Swiss-Prot record:
The chain crosses the membrane at residues 7-27, 33-53, 62-82, 88-108. SUPFAM superfamilies: Multidrug resistance efflux transporter EmrE. Keywords: Cell membrane, Membrane, Plasmid, Transmembrane, Transmembrane helix. This is UPF0060 membrane protein Arth_4238. It comes from Arthrobacter sp. (strain FB24).
């Protein structure tokens, strides 16, 4: 259950952070209404809160591992919402990042 919870929280955090940043981008760079940026700021707040729900107690570990999720999630978001087509290097890089996430979060550690 801990692995499933960790993954679910990373997906929630990614949706909130990437979605929030995308909303701000739309307002600033694409000329959308100002309230898009406001919604983006709210979503970014949800991202910050979601990280606190992770079962691991170490801020540095959570945010370092989340960085890999952010890389892969950003590419996926771009594909879905902006028609971005990642090349093989984007995909290879994101797979490497996700492998790093798995090592950081799920490697066996001593309790002490």
């Amino acid at each position: 259950m801990t692995i499933a919870k960790t993954i679910l929280l990373f997906v929630l955090a990614a949706a909130a952070e990437i979605g929030g940043a995308w909303l701000v981008w739309q307002a600033v760079r694409e000329g959308k209404e100002w309230w898009w940026a406001g919604l983006g700021v709210l979503a970014l707040g949800v991202y910050g809160f979601a990280a606190t729900l992770q079962p691991d107690a170490h801020f540095g570990r959570i945010l370092a591992a989340y960085g890999g999720v952010f890389v892969a999630g950003s590419l996926a978001w771009g594909m879905v919402f902006d028609g971005f087509r990642p090349d093989r290097w984007d995909i290879i890089g994101s797979v490497i990042c996700l492998l790093g996430v798995a090592v950081i979060m799920f490697a066996p550690r001593n309790a002490g």
